[in-house]
């Protein structure tokens, strides 16, 4: 596949894609902004604790590969980064808003069911129903320039099969044995997480506003 990302590169690109949609007033992101986004505890699996130097290394690599570009000058006191991974002027990868939302959520959280994806991607795109989620996943799985996602075998105790992105290579389709006591309703859990994400982003916006008022 043309697009091959390491786990850390996937996290960085996923964060930039997410913030471009959910907090456009804070986008593009500085290095510190990318570090905060990579390490946030909501809507991330696994939760990471990356240092600034680790993130800077990933940013430099992605700029060299033309997946990101730097933005400086015109009032920016620090270098900022914006994604060119998809939907850029000269890039080949073109995705719909629904496709961006699903790909971003998969980059940030790994394999998930359609129900989990619908709830967790709601901040980026409001799917009308589960049929739209599933049809978008099928489109991503069958694109001529892809496939970009794959459907995994259904795990024990789960009602839905999970999907995973293919931007980091092929996925080993080996469902783990799941404790039935942990087989909670994925939709409900995802909705709770979506609310936590919304609260965290509102707090981030409030902190940013207070910081500007204090300048």
From Swiss-Prot:
Gene3D superfamilies per UniProt? Winged helix-like DNA-binding domain superfamily/Winged helix DNA-binding domain
Has UniProt tagged this entry with the keyword Transmembrane?
A: no
Q: Does the keyword Acetylation apply?
A: yes
Instruction: Could you list this entry's UniProt keywords, alphabetically sorted.
Output: Acetylation
Positions of modified residues (N6-acetyllysine)? 80
Q: Which Pfam families match?
A: DUF480
What family is reported?
Answer: Belongs to the UPF0502 family.
Matches recorded under PANTHER family = UPF0502 PROTEIN YCEH
Name-wise, this protein is UPF0502 protein YceH
Q: Which gene encodes it?
A: yceH
């Amino acid at each position: 596949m043309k697009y091959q990302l390491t786990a850390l590169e996937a996290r960085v690109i996923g964060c930039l894609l997410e913030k471009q949609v959910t907090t456009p007033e804070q986008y593009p992101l500085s290095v510190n902004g990318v570090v905060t986004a990579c390490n946030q505890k909501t809507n991330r699996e696994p939760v990471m604790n990356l240092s600034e130097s680790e993130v800077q290394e990933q940013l430099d690599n992605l700029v060299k590969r033309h997946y990101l570009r730097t933005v400086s000058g015109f009032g920016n006191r620090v270098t900022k980064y914006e994604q060119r991974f998809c939907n850029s002027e000269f890039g080949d990868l073109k995705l719909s808003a629904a496709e961006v939302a699903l790909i971003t959520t998969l980059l940030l959280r790994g394999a998930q069911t359609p129900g989990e994806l619908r709830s967790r991607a709601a901040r980026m795109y409001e799917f009308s129903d589960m049929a739209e989620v599933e049809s978008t996943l099928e489109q991503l799985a069958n694109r001529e320039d892809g496939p970009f996602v794959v459907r995994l075998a259904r795990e024990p105790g789960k009602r839905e099969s999970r999907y995973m992105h293919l931007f980091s290579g092929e996925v080993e389709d080996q469902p783990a044995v799941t404790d039935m006591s942990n087989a909670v309703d994925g939709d409900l859990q995802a909705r709770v997480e979506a609310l936590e994400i919304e609260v965290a982003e509102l707090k981030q916006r409030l902190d940013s506003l207070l910081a500007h008022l204090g300048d």
